[in-house]
Every structure is written in C-alpha cells, then in structure tokens.
C-alpha cells in the first residue's frame, strides 16, 4: 500500500470514528428548536469564522432554499457572515470582535436562534455573539470541538466533536448541519 492510500484509509477511519461520537439526543433537540422557530416565524441566525463561516452559509442555503422551497411553512434564516460589506464595515469602524454582535442587535428577539460555529470554541467574536444572544432571550447552539472552549460552556445547547483536527471537525460540522437541514427536506411531516 502506498503512502497516499494509507493516509486516505486513516483519514476515513478517523472520520468514521468521530461520527460515532455525535450525540443524537443533542442533535434532536436542535431539530426541535429549528422546528419551533419555523412554526413561530422566528429568525435563525448563524455565524462562524473562516471554514466555519462557509459551513454557516451552506446551512442557510440548505434551510432557506432546500427545506423551504415549495412548502407552506418556511424558515427565516440568515448567516451573519454573508454580507462582506457589513462584516468589514464593523471590523474597520468598530472592531473585529463586534462583527457578529452588532449585527445581532438588529435581529435579536426572544425565541430567535443563534447557531455559532467555532473550531476552537474561543473566538472572541463568536463568544460575544453568544453572550449577547443569551442575554437577549435567543436560544443558542454552539458547534465546536469536544474540548469546546468557552463556547461549549456558554451555549445553551452544544453540539461537539472530540477532535482538534480542523479537517475532521469541519467534516463533522457539515454532517451535523446536513442532518439539521435534511430532516426537514426529506421528511414531509416536518
């Protein structure tokens, strides 16, 4: 077996092992919260940095288009990472730590949901957003590493993966967000 094949096998084996550690009860709670938000016409907001920002954006596409198109009940979801003009305006004029919390102030109302995604669980802008959301009556969901940093501690619901390997972590985040989306896309009772 060549080195590349060995790497591929090991990567797949570790990904498989990590998927077995995901918490079905916690993911089911997140599904329930999303369903309640849709039924009450509440906003679901998502944020992250770097690869986590792209995961937040992809989740919005799957929910807003995939789980809403052609259905009577529609989700209202927005990624706080998608307007580069807004993000850079706050980063330049206020601070990078405030790029999400300042946007949240426009959307915060009790019953809305904030989904925050962070590999380290310690990104200052993510933590400020969660703290503000908690104080404003939003439900908060954190996707992070098993060690979780502060995000794991301050999120009302934590969906964690026990690894610090960013590739495996992001693979698992994508899988969890796809579960959260596809349960609505493929199941008409939802």
Which ranges hold each PLM region?
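Short, glycine/polar-rich helix-capping loops at beta-to-alpha or helix-loop-helix junctions
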Residues: 143-155
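A charged, well-structured terminal subsegment
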Residues: 106, 167-190
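Short glycine/serine/threonine-rich phosphate/pyrophosphate-binding segments
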Residues: 52-57, 122-129, 151
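Generic N-terminal amphipathic, Lys/Arg-enriched alpha-helix
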Residues: 1-21
